[in-house]
Amino acid sequence: MQPDFLILGCLLCIVLVLQILALLRRSDHTALDHVLREEHRVGRAELREQLETLERQQEVRLASFARSLTDLVARIDQRLDQLTASLGEDARKGRQEASEGQQRFADALGQRLTELTQRNAQSINEMRTTLEQQLHVLRADNAQQLEQIRTIVDEKLQTTLNTRLDSSFKLVSERLEQVQRGLGEMQQLATGVGDLKRVLTHVKSRGTWGEVQLDNILDQTLTQEQYARGVRVCPDASEIVDFAVRLPGRGQYEAPVWLPIDVKCPKEDYERLLDAQEQADQELVRTMGVQLERAIKIQAKSIRDKYIVPPHTTDFAVMFLPTEGLYAETIRRPGLADVLQREYRVVVAGPTTVTALLNSLQMGFRTLAIEQRSSEVWSLLGAVKSEFGKFAGILEKAEKQINTVGKSLGEAGRKTRTIERRLRGVESLSQEQTQVLLDGLDVDTAESDVDSDASF
């Protein structure tokens, strides 16, 4: 290919030289210019033809080279495929051989382990059988000897302990029953105290009116024996109070003292005060407040004059106001509560406060009952303490006897083992001789039992 390029270059140089000469002589040699132009055209045509020929040759050579390259790539791919298949087959054979070798090794190892396991299990079973037989024989001998000793000891201890423990437990049971009855009564009192606490923290009856509301509160708080309805507090008078709480007298047989509780509800005066407060009329509010105070004082004076009659009643009474709002307004009035307590000896109470007051009285009743029964419980506990002291002494004696028997059993076991060691080489007797010796031992045992009973 290089000579062709050299020829083509030379031709191009000649054409350029001719063109330069033609340009230099254009003005004087027109004919020559025409000739040169024709030759130049012919030269370009020849040059184009040569270039096309050269291009075709190059294409033919390139096509041949491409076919050769394609054939070479195909042969290389075929060779690589053959090589890959050969390597894969070799690897598969290697893996198969390795797997077969591992399997043979695992089978041999498993068989060896199985044989070792079977031999060990057989040896262990033989050892276990031998030990069980020896232990069974030893256990049977010990059990027989200990059973004989235990039978004798149990008979003695059972007779003595049953007699003494029965008498002691009978006496203690009687005392404990008395204590249990006393504690049961105290538990009932404690339950009542719990009910009292629940009522103090969760009062259900609120916001109702008059005597029905107070009756419900009394019924929820006190028992029927602790209060009464429509009580004539003074035998010489005809005034009857709505409700009265029965307080115990100073002595056991003295008449009860009544705590009067009267229901008062100046509803009209309170409603007029509420209307004035809604109208925001300060002067009217002040006037209605004064009227409410006057009505409360009139009711307190009426209670004092009618129902406070010492010694038949307490030296004060309770005015029950059925609504919390009326009670709060009464307490809120400056100095009104103090005047009622100091001048009229009347305590104002609403639904909540009267419940708290009644609960306090209920607590006092329960405390009084506990005080009355505490001396009985204390005496009973003293008797139980004395019996427990005796019972502790009996248990201590029984413990000493049981310890003595345990030591005797331990000593008998040690002597039994010593005798067994020494009798290993002794020849066994016949059945008749053995029975005769055992009968002799029974006689000796009976005599020792008689001696032991005498010692107990």
Swiss-Prot record:
The alphabetical list of record keywords is:
Coiled coil, DNA recombination
Q: What does this protein do?
A: Involved in DNA recombination.
User: Any one Gene Ontology biological process term?
Assistant: DNA recombination
The name this protein carries in UniProt is DNA recombination protein RmuC homolog
| Pfam families recorded | RmuC
The source organism is Xylella fastidiosa (strain Temecula1 / ATCC 700964)
Which InterPro entries does UniProt cross-reference here? DNA_recombination_RmuC
Keyword Coiled coil on entry: yes
Q: Which family does it belong to?
A: Belongs to the RmuC family.
User: Mind telling me which SUPFAM superfamilies this protein's record contains?
Assistant: Apolipoprotein A-I (SSF58113)
- Tree of life domain: Bacteria
Q: Which chain positions lie within coiled-coil regions?
A: 36-60, 106-158
- PANTHER family (UniProt xref): DNA RECOMBINATION PROTEIN RMUC
